[in-house]
Amino acid sequence: MRLAHVSLIARDAPALAEFYCTALGCSPRRSATRLSGAWVGRGIGLPGAEILSIWLNLPDSGAPFLEIQQFALNPGHPPPQPDTPGLRHLAFATADIEATARAILAAGGSQQGEITDLGSAEHPCRALYMRDPEGNLIELEQA
């Protein structure tokens, strides 16, 4: 068994996909696809669902991939906080945490915290929490 993909639900899937490509080096895996019909509703347990689905390759990886979905009818929810139960964040390893943070800010993201060392004396690991334009948490790690 292996992890196949991670999915984010977006208010604007094309814009969020562009952010991940620009700021973090993701690349399109396939063309954007519209999913609808009874089979989609049965599959995800939401009758009448209409979804725009975008798949992105993560940097330096063929799998797993990042899926960004936009539902036609989405009531919206506040962005998750660092202590919210459930999926907390996407973490990206980077050789230059400051440069990656600048790229995220330039592409429309925001900074959540400050750079800190979450590692040990033997294995330092600089980390920084950021947010994408829709408020999803991103952790940057530089080991």
Where in this protein do the model-derived segments appear?
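Vicinal oxygen chelate
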Residues: 8, 30-31, 64-67, 92-143
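Core segments of cupin and vicinal oxygen chelate
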Residues: 9-62, 99
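Generic beta-structure capping elements
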Residues: 59, 69-73, 143
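Eukaryotic phosphotyrosine signaling hubs
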Residues: 3, 85-89
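Short beta-strand/turn micro-motifs at beta-sheet edges
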Residues: 77-79
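Short solvent-exposed loop/turn micro-motifs enriched in small/polar/acidic residues
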Residues: 1, 48-49, 121-123
